[in-house]
Amino acid sequence: MADNQVPKRHCQYPLLALLNTPDQPIPHHVPTTPQKQSRARRRLENELESTAQTSNHTAPQTPWAVTTTGTSVTITTRTKDGTQVVVTLHL
């Protein structure tokens, strides 16, 4: 078999070539985790409702449309050039 020919098993199983690839070097910089907020706490539903009732803040008009169906949330918007973007999150 000549050096420029690929062995038959590599044609049939191309992923076998990955066995001969060198290991990736370990990155020198490891990202750090963000610091937790010391005052953050989980709010109960009734606290959220009372806050919403007493707040005079009105939400600004946004170009986003949010739709929920069962266990999914869909967000729809349009870019400045008119392209529609739809993101669906399945919970």
UniProtKB/Swiss-Prot annotation:
InterPro entries: Papilloma_E4
Pfam families the record matches: Pap_E4
Cell compartments where the protein resides: Host cytoplasm; Host nucleus
Chain residue ranges for the region called Disordered: 20-64
Modification after translation, per record: Phosphorylated by host ERK. The phosphorylation triggers a structural change that enhances keratin binding and protein stability.
Taxonomy, superkingdom: Viruses
Sorted UniProt keywords: Early protein, Host cytoplasm, Host G2/M cell cycle arrest by virus, Host nucleus, Host-virus interaction, Modulation of host cell cycle by virus, Phosphoprotein
Cellular component aspect of the GO annotation: host cell cytoplasm; host cell nucleus
GO biological process: symbiont-mediated arrest of host cell cycle during G2/M transition
Stretches with biased composition (Polar residues): 49-61
Subunit structure: Assembles into oligomeric complexes. Interacts with host CDK1. Interacts with host SRPK1; this interaction may favor expression of late viral transcripts. Interacts with host cytokeratin components KRT8 and KRT18.
Chain's role: Contributes to multiple aspects of the viral life cycle including viral genome amplification, suppression of suprabasal cell differentiation and egress of newly formed virions. Induces host cell cycle arrest at the G2 phase by associating with and preventing the nuclear entry of host CDK1/cyclin B1 complexes. Inhibits cellular DNA replication by preventing loading of host replication licensing proteins MCM2 and MCM7 onto chromatin. Within the cytoplasm, associates with host kinase SRPK1, a splicing factor regulator, and inhibits its activity.
Note: The major E4 form is first synthesized as an E1^E4 fusion protein from spliced E1^E4 transcripts, such that the first few amino acids of the E4 protein are derived from the N terminus of E1.
Family named by the database record: Belongs to the papillomaviridae E4 protein family.
The name this protein goes by in its record: Protein E4
Protein's organism: Human papillomavirus type 54
